C-alpha cells in the first residue's frame, strides 16, 4: 500500500515494529478485507502468516512467488515505485492493483502509476482490467452525488 499522506499531512516517524508502523496505513484495506472474507478468516490468515504487509522500500531484491499481491491506493504510487513492485512478480503469482484516478494525492498527478499501468499493459494477454463506475458505488447512495459534484467542479 502506498504510504502517501493527504496533501502535506505528514504524521512523522512511528515507533514500533514494521507491522506496527504499517498498521495505520493498512487499516482501511484490512477493514474492507474483513468485510469481504470475514474477520475470522483474516485472523486465520494472519495467524498462519499468510498475510504479509510490506512497504515498497523493502521490496527490492525479493521475488514474490506463490502469492497474490494486492497493491491498494495504486493511484498514489509513483511510476518508479510501481516498477519496483511489478518486477518482484515471481512464479505462480498474481498482482492486483486497486485505486481511483479521482483520488490522486501526489503533488504531480502525472507521476501516478494507475493510469500508466492501465494504458501501457492493456494489450498484454496476461493482464486484465476491471473499471468500476458510478453504478458500482455501494458505500452510500450519497457518494454518487458527491462524486458528481466534484467531477463537475473538476476538483
Give names to the regions the model predicted.
Residues 1-155:
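Conserved helicase motor core of SF1/SF2 NTP-dependent helicases
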